[in-house]
Amino acid sequence: VEKLDFHDVDYWDELTTLLEWSKTHVFSSFFICWAAQAALYYFYGVSKYLLSHKLTGVYLHHTNVEKMQRKILRGFDYQFYAPHSRYTSVSKEDIEKIDDLDILAESKEAGVYIVASKDGSRFFVTGHPEYDPDTLDKEYKRDLANPDIISEMPKNYYLNDDIHNEIQVKWRSHAYLIFANWLNYYVYQQTPYNLDELKER
């Protein structure tokens, strides 16, 4: 599905119906990986681009220090790790053209990572902070078993980049922070008790 044009995805109409519904029924939305790309395209017209090979592994990121006052970044170190597993990406230049969006974190290798609307109603995360320790391992071994896939070993994941060594879990504290911050500051504290008060955002 990731390599398909959005409009060629079988459930695109159903998905866009939900995205449109969220404008008036959801105070803050959090989109991950392909869903982040799809939502960026639907709400802002940001296209995705096919990479030359699968981006997979655990990559070093840095926060945008000028945006550290954003509550989603509370407790973040200036540098942190996060997993990625995808064949497509979005362009930093395309996002920077949109006044309503802020790039909050990115990676030299993996590109843009956290994008947020200025009002906090939408967050777009291009990686997978939710991944379990062994998720990338399972994906890699699945791909190895498929002769139609050119498998890529996850970078910075196995000790010394050796599949026979233990997995290095470097993203857990970041994962807890990003989800806890979003739920606390943008869902629990700001969603109005009367949902009829939600305005189109």
Provide a role label for each language-model segment:
Residues 1-2, 119:
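Short, histidine-centered active-site or binding-site loop motifs used for metal coordination
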Residues 2-65:
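Cysteine-nucleophile active-site neighborhood
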Residues 17-20, 56, 60-201:
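Amide-donor transfer/coupling interface in amidating biosynthetic enzymes
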